Amino acid sequence: LGDPSRNINYDKIQAEHDLKKYFGISKVIFIEGIPDGDLTKGHIDGIARFIETRTVVVVQCTSNSLCQPNSKDAKIYDNAAKIIEEAGFNVIREPIEGFVQYNNQKFDTNYMNWLVGNGFVIAPGFGNSITDAKAKSRIESYFPNRDVHIIEMLSSWAAGGGVHCHTNDQPAFSLQQG
């Protein structure tokens, strides 16, 4: 649901009903709040990601990131981790180890917006060899049987989208001959 300017007439009750009906799930966990530094305005793929059936990775602010520990954003991420853990899942925290400046914008190096494919994971890169390498190593530990690739996506990230955003929900359509 995220940003209040989206899905104006769609509430949690309807969302939970639809998720259970159309996806056959039994439990829905709602995460509250939109981090100020979240360019996607509350998309879950920048906050928490499943890596196994019972394990969820949740982002964590650090003293090197724009979202500082004990900030509003940190409290949103910490609360998300708590809610997910209380729902019975294992939680791993994914540190935001820095930030970048690109086209007069500053944003955190949040590597959560990855794509998982058959035998591979592609994660956004931020052109910082140190944080990109550390993130790659962590993501490899989350997905030990997959090849992990970090791809620099600064212009895309600055526009509010990452790897998962660009590859999710590809519509099926047929080309019409003219």
Go through the PLM ranges and name each one.
Residues 1-178:
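The feature marks the mature, well-folded catalytic cores of soluble enzymes
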